[in-house]
Amino acid sequence: MTEYLFTSESVSEGHPDKIADQISDALLDEILKQDLKARVACETYVKTGMVLIGGEITTTAWVDVEEITRKTINDIGYVNSDAGFDANSCAVLSAIGKQSPDINQGINRFDPLKQGAGDQGIIFGYATNETEFFMPAPITYAHLLMQKQSELRKKNILPWLRPDAKSQVTFKYNNGNIIAIDTVVLSTQHQENITQKYLKEAVMDEIIKPVLPDKWLTKNTKFFINPTGRFVIGGPMGDCGVTGRKIIVDTYGGMSRHGGGAFSGKDPSKVDRSAAYAARYVAKNIVASGLAARCEIQLSYAIGIAEPISIMIDTFNTGKISNSALISLVRSIFDLRPYGLIKMLNLLQPIYLKTAVYGHFGRKEFPWENLDKVNELS
């Protein structure tokens, strides 16, 4: 019998790094509404009283960077200085340039199917049958806890909650199967006048218990709610935030490998983002078809080259056919060239702000979660 623990974390939409991700993707969406051929690499930095937006953007669109930034922060819930950040009074600074023509000549082609990758890179996708979402349980439930915190805050059910929060869930496995939840950590920013006793009871009763399945909670499950005892100072006042610093939260919670490339603020010509979505799409369809219980796929690209340089698949000894046979199937069914995967997944649309919080994967509203290749794979 082989028992082990595995832990994943998530953060709320009010976490500083997630504020940055959302601003970058909000700007990307507004640009794509006007210009589907735009090249966008938008980075955001937030700290007390200020937002700095930089990067490279080449587009025919005009967007009001300041207005979009303030609206995004306001929608998150930072509407006055009491929470440590104010959408209406913070400074918004812009240092945006254009995409290098050296890069552009490797991407744009007269024949779009020959569109080259926007950069070199290694990309991973993953799926598992351990949850209904074909996602690992630790990251799934860490996200659900954060979504519940946001829901209760925005509906004023727990009006003393503030936007910044973090969760961490540790599952116990036996031979790859979940047997229990070992530990739950949840820290949430709050108003100053709330007692710790009341906060802990409310978080347990209103956030944790409604989200986590009873079948995995035992008398030995440990709960740590605001373990420092106080979380009043949060958001950008507590820590600076930068686009792309929560890449494990954005993907599989550490259950799968990661190529290192972040997602937010990048248009689909950047394979860091678009090929990661395609890799998830491939892995999920393989698992849903019954060809494997778990599947990880690696793709690699070279700048300016259309075809992937390599494809690797690992099914962790759960595959019904060999990994090499799976790779052959993938090559015949999925178009993994940059333009091919953009078209396959309909990525040229303004859907990216929604991806910037609570994970890019395991959410049915996104096209890379479709299971429309299951029959072809079966």
Swiss-Prot record:
PROSITE patterns: ADOMET_SYNTHASE_1 (PS00376), ADOMET_SYNTHASE_2 (PS00377). Pathway: Amino-acid biosynthesis; S-adenosyl-L-methionine biosynthesis; S-adenosyl-L-methionine from L-methionine: step 1/1. Keywords: ATP-binding, Cytoplasm, Magnesium, Metal-binding, Nucleotide-binding, One-carbon metabolism, Potassium, Transferase. It catalyses: L-methionine + ATP + H2O = S-adenosyl-L-methionine + phosphate + diphosphate. It comes from the Bacteria. Mg(2+) binds at D17. Its cofactor is Mg(2+); K(+). GO terms for biological process: one-carbon metabolic process; S-adenosylmethionine biosynthetic process. L-methionine binds at E56, Q99, D239, K270. One of its GO terms (cellular component) is cytoplasm. CDD domains: S-AdoMet_synt (cd18079). Residues 99-109 are annotated as: Flexible loop. It is found in: Cytoplasm. ATP binds at H15, D164, A165, K166, R230, F231, D239, R245, K246, A262, K266. K(+) binds at E43. One of its GO terms (molecular function) is methionine adenosyltransferase activity. Its EC number is 2.5.1.6. Pfam families: S-AdoMet_synt_C, S-AdoMet_synt_M, S-AdoMet_synt_N. Binds 2 divalent ions per subunit. Homotetramer; dimer of dimers. Belongs to the AdoMet synthase family. Catalyzes the formation of S-adenosylmethionine (AdoMet) from methionine and ATP. The overall synthetic reaction is composed of two sequential steps, AdoMet formation and the subsequent tripolyphosphate hydrolysis which occurs prior to release of AdoMet from the enzyme. This is S-adenosylmethionine synthase.
